[in-house]
Design a protein with these regions (language model features):
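Serine-hydrolase catalytic machinery in alpha/beta-hydrolase-like enzymes
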Residues: 13-114, 126, 157, 191
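Active-site nucleophile loop of the alpha/beta-hydrolase fold
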Residues: 79-80, 141-149, 194
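Gly/Ala-rich beta-loop-alpha elbow adjacent to hydrolase catalytic centers
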Residues: 119-127
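Hydrolases whose catalytic domains are alpha/beta-hydrolase-1, hotdog thioesterase
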Residues: 126-130, 150
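Short beta-strand/loop motif that positions the catalytic acidic residue
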Residues: 163-165, 170-172
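Conserved alpha/beta-hydrolase "acid-adjacent" motif
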Residues: 173, 177-183
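Catalytic histidine-centered segment of alpha/beta-hydrolase-like enzymes
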Residues: 194-208
């Protein structure tokens, strides 16, 4: 799984209207799953991209491949600014509004079953801030940007993590300049080789996620 740099082909791509403009949801399904209509699965992940990157980030690709291999669905969601071709997104509140709208529409028209929300970096922050609004069963944070590097004057983002009332998995690079948040009774933190990009050992990223997912979602072989 090393060196993965592009997202696998989606079984279905859905454009979703949000108050911030159209977003795009790329639906990835376990083998043999009919992509038409509403998809019933034991559980699904809805993951967002980082501030300056897209859904082809190596960690997102690795998690998508691993989770669908377990029997879960994965949606890689593009924020409206990315769909519009912009490289820089709006501030957090606008991201949160769009993200919440995406998850609501996925629940209403695409996916049946419990959802884990999450993403990498800025996408992880968005998922944390909206965990209650989206009804997430759990939150997956890849490379959570705890403290801006070299900016001790800037407030820590740790309160966003602490406010999440459901189980959280944080997968963090050992040399991430944004630091590593502490664990807690409801927050598991797994440190893997690499920096903020989490591309040095994507197999370790995938392994951390596949170990955790069955603890927060029904197993695919459950009756």
């Amino acid at each position: 799984m090393r060196g993965v740099t592009s997202a696998p082909a989606a079984a279905r791509v859905v454009e979703i209207d949000t108050p911030q403009g159209p977003a795009r949801a790329h639906l990835h399904l376990p083998a043999g799953t009919d992509p038409g209509g509403r998809v019933t699965v034991p559980g699904a992940l809805v993951l967002g991209h980082g501030a300056g990157g897209g859904i082809g980030a190596p960690d997102l690709v690795a998690v998508t491949t691993a989770a669908t291999g377990l029997g879960y669905a994965v949606v890689l969601a593009e924020q409206p600014y990315r769909v519009a071709g912009k490289k820089v997104g709006p501030r957090g509140p606008a991201l949160d509004v769009a993200w919440t709208a995406v998850v609501e529409q996925l629940r209403a028209h695409v996916l049946v079953g419990p959802l884990v929300t999450g993403g990498r970096s800025a996408g992880a922050r968005t998922a944390c801030r909206t965990a209650v609004a989206t009804g997430a069963a759990a939150v997956l944070c890849l490379a959570f940007p705890t403290q801006p590097p070299g900016r001790p004057d800037r407030p820590s983002r740790l309160p966003e993590l602490d406010a999440v009332p459901v189980p959280v998995l944080v997968v963090q690079g050992a040399t991430d300049p944004y630091g590593t948040p502490p664990g807690s009774p409801t927050r598991r933190v797994v440190v893997v080789p690499g920096d903020h990009a989490l591309k040095k050992d994507v197999a370790a990223v995938a392994a951390a996620v596949t170990t955790w997912l069955p603890t927060v979602l029904p197993t695919p072989d459950a009756p």
